[in-house]
């Protein structure tokens, strides 16, 4: 079914509508009010809170601009048929149409669909321009919640690999989204700078420095040879390991900074053990009868708290296990530093540790629902038809630095945020080298460059944007213009959903959609051509500015630059 001709907009700028709530909120209140009216008129026991009214944009434009399933989810409570209830709701809504609604229609088994004039989109445009890059799309879903996001936390025993980089992009983008949505966010990297892996690193370093055979399980990468050439310290395994770990960590920091990942805190595992926090944490568990000794080791009764088996906290040789350190660390997060919520981003190889960590957190008196663990799945890279092989420098992994040097930091960020964290993914490096619409990085950044080009062309022609209050935004009626407006109107909802669902990839999808819509507008709607009405040209210039704002917000959340030229 083809879409009927859309009615002309009733709204210019500034708007005369005094209700500045988002259209979604207005429709929700209208629907809740209609439910109340139907309940009174028909004697139904039915009350609906506006916040529970589900509204969505239909997948097909011919079904209208907004749709609600309220009749289907409340019909049973009301003791009536969903379609009959929807029919009554349509009749009530038609008596007093909400602003911008031109028709309300019954569809399918009980959907209520709304068709709107274009004025709601012009209102959204005015909101983008009034609030700007700093103010638009800042839905307060966090209400000041203090959230710590721990991510990457790779052992400082070798160069950071692609998997860590990909999961790092997720953690950083999630932190950016949370910060924009009313959360107080702290980004943290947990440095595993003690224990067996540091001693193994020390033995590997000393073996290379002395020309001896590598120890079993030693680190084989060329970076160890480079470090050995610099080392002039004592022949002490722990001292050598700590020295090498410090140098490697400096390199990790530089690598991550090159893709815009900056941490608020680098938290040392060694500092936890040296402070006595591990012993204190074990003592707290012991006081609850959750610790026992067996075979010379100290065990945690985690099975009785939902784990598949009990876990060792301290080995027979006296070394604390990763779990013991993690529990002391999370005790510090929740009970010492007082975070309301902690989000840990781990690699999938940590899957077996989640239940024991949750059990330990609960045993320490923390509601385990306050701890969220996100597991990043395996990442594979191809280059055209060729699998990207592990490099000699990293030893047993694909080096993130190599990828950044090849495709650049922006491409690395966007590529790593193209698919969900919990899906094993294969990425083609060749796809982000092409200057074509198939290259998501080029396609998105070209939209930004075209926006910059419009500004340069306007300056060249000495065309200045008139004050917004003088602009008639209702002139923007071309389908391509409306596509851009719809996309901009969606951004606050997209950002909110990305925060609630912990899914920054939703922003990636939106950015690509805006870029596509802007390219269509740029191609079909001349802005500064001689035959364009000056009033329309001014409205289009403001639409370009709104697109710049939206793209800057979206790319900023992804940690990607918005170039003014390419």
Which residue ranges define each predicted feature?
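Non-catalytic interaction-recognition regions
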Residues: 2-122, 129-566
């Amino acid at each position: 079914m083809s879409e009927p001709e859309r009615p002309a907009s009733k709204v210019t700028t500034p708007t005369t509508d005094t209700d500045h709530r988002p259209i979604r909120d207005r429709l929700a209140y209208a629907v809740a009010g209609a439910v109340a009216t139907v309940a009174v008129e028909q004697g139904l026991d039915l009350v609906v809170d506006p916040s529970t009214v589900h509204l969505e944009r239909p997948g097909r434009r011919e079904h209208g601009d907004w749709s609600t399933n309220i009749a289907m989810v409340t019909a049973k409570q009301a003791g009536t048929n969903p379609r009959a209830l929807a029919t009554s709701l349509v009749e009530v809504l038609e008596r007093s149409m909400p602003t911008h609604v031109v028709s309300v229609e019954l569809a399918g088994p009980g959907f209520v669909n709304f068709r709107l004039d274009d004025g709601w989109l012009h209102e959204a445009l005015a909101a983008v321009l009034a609030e700007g890059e700093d103010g638009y799309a800042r839905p307060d879903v966090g209400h000041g919640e203090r959230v710590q996001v721990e991510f990457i936390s790779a052992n400082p025993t070798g160069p950071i690999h692609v998997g860590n980089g990909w999961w790092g992009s997720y953690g950083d983008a999630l932190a950016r989204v949370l910060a924009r949505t009313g959360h107080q966010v702290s980004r943290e990297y947990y440095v595993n700078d003690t224990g067996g892996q540091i001693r193994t690193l020390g033995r590997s370093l000393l073996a290379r420095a002395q020309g001896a055979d590598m120890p079993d399980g030693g680190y084989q990468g060329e970076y160890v040879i480079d470090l050995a050439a610099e080392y002039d310290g004592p022949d002490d395994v722990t001292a050598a390991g700590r020295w090498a770990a410090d140098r490697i960590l400096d390199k990790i920091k530089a690598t991550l900074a090159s893709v815009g990942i900056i941490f608020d805190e680098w938290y040392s595992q060694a500092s936890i053990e040296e402070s006595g926090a591990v012993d204190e944490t074990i003592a707290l568990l012991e006081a609850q009868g959750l610790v026992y000794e067996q075979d010379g080791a100290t065990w945690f009764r985690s099975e009785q708290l939902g784990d598949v088996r009990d876990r060792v906290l301290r080995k027979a040789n006296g070394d604390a296990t990763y779990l013991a350190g993690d529990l002391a660390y999370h005790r510090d997060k929740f009970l010492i530093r007082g975070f309301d919520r902690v989000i840990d981003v781990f690699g999938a190889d940590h899957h077996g540790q989640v239940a024991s960590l949750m059990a330990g957190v609960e045993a320490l008196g923390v509601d385990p629902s306050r701890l969220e663990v996100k597991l990043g799945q395996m990442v594979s890279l191809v280059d055209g038809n060729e699998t990207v092989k592990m490099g000699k420098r990293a030893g047993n992994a694909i080096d993130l630095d190599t990828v950044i040097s090849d495709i650049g930091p922006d491409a690395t960020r966007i590529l790593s945020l193209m698919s969900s964290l919990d899906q094993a993914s294969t990425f083609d490096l060749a796809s982000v080298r092409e200057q074509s619409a198939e290259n998501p990085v080029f396609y998105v950044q070209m939209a930004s460059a075209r926006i910059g080009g419009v500004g340069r062309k306007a300056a060249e022609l000495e065309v200045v944007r008139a004050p917004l209050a003088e602009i008639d935004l209702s002139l923007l009626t071309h389908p391509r213009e409306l596509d851009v407006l719809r996309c901009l109107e969606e951004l606050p909802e997209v950002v909110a959903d990305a925060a609630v669902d912990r899914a920054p990839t939703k922003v990636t999808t939106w950015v690509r959609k805006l870029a596509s819509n802007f390219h269509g507008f740029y191609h079909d709607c001349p802005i500064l051509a001689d035959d364009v009405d000056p009033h329309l040209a001014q409205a289009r210039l403001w639409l370009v500015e709104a697109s710049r704002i939206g793209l800057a917000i979206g790319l900023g959340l992804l940690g990607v630059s918005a170039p003014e030229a390419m």
